[in-house]
Amino acid sequence: HSAGGRNAWMYAVTHPGKVSSLMVVDIDPDADNPESRSMFERYHAEPDEWESLEAVIERLRGRQPASTDEMLRHQALHMTRELPGGRRVWKRDRALLEAYERPDLWEEWRRISCPTLIVRGRQSDLLRHDVAVRMREEIKRVRLVELDGGGHWFYQEQHGAFETTVRWFLQRPP
């Protein structure tokens, strides 16, 4: 999902014999994506520490309003660690977040040789429909699925549809 998808396809390109199929979830190969830049700007502006787990959950709810309380709690627990006194801190390296560069990966995208599934939430601003279609056209063994009812976090917002899509792809790769 997201930047992890970029990492996955780079691994698939550099180690083609080790990857039998690939899923890319709501991310594109573009170097400059205004929505991605906006998301990172919001992450930069966030505090490193939060008063409580509930405060983290509320922050996540603001980003992902369609996610269930259970999903948000799970995410908050695994994305933060508890400090003495009950405060929470993100499990992230701020220096990496600030140094993150988004290279153009279209050339690498075209080198993917394994069956690939592109999954996009129709309400996502991060992976636009026109870019997803171009991604589908650039490589041979690929399928594009666009799911209704969610944005960038649709695997949480519409987890049943996402799971069905994953199972379908794994059973019938292109």
What is each stretch, according to the model?
Residues 81-138, 143-146:
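Conserved serine/cysteine hydrolase catalytic core
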Residues 9-53:
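Flexible "cap/lid" loop of the alpha/beta hydrolase fold
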Residues 33, 49-108:
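Conserved alpha/beta-hydrolase catalytic His-Asp/Glu region
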Residues 165-173:
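C-terminal alpha-helix
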Residues 147-163:
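Catalytic histidine-centered segment of alpha/beta-hydrolase-like enzymes
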Residues 1-2:
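Conserved alpha/beta-hydrolase "nucleophile elbow" surrounding the catalytic nucleophile
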Residues 18-20, 139-142, 150:
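Core-facing hydrophobic residues within beta-strands of well-ordered domains
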Residues 48, 124, 151-154:
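Glycosyltransferase donor-binding loop in the core domain
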